[in-house]
Amino acid sequence: PLGLRIFNPVQQAAEWYGLLRPADMAKLESGKLPFAEAIELIADRCAEQDRVLILRDWNHLDYIGLPFMQPDYRPQLAETLNAEFELIRFATVRHPLDQWLSLIRNPLFAERLPVGKYLKGVRRFAEMARGTGMLHYEDFTANPDATLMRLCEALQLPFDPGYRQRWASYKNITGDVLPGRSEVGEIRALPRRDTGAEVEKAFTARGDFQRTLQLMNYTDTVSG
């Protein structure tokens, strides 16, 4: 719910998937429908078409926040919807150093994401994710089919092996702002970008980093 000003699920449901009727849109555009009721409407339209509603949470706002807001370290989407829905929650995680290196490539975060602030948020997120279950991004790039099968099983969804032929051209997704995904055309592990000794020291010296590795079941420190 915190990201509505940037990414609107109602707009996505209408424009990406054609789920909403004109009467639905009129009701939503009146501004009188609470967030949970809007999601319930989308879920109802999914059910009518034998589809399953999957919500991809933007946990950055809840646990890191910068540069948009200060985090409060709570899964606000889940807390907002728990009363109305029986949620199945699951997390995908990446090595915290690689995640930081990826974030700071984006001009929004470069020079605005101190290591200490970032690691506190990631550690708090990892504490939450231990309760939902998680899988590693690195496992997916190493063995896409087996890892995606695990994710589908956790979410009680059928596995579609045809995803390999379609993923690179799939555009109905937010956050895919950096070039290269469709150009590569295959799912593969990439080498870690050079960090330098100073960055490695800044991470390894912090208890939040070491605790996050434990919570996320990473056995290394700064190696990918």
Where would I find each of the regions flagged by the language model?
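PAPS-dependent sulfotransferase catalytic core
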Residues: 1-48, 56-58, 164-220
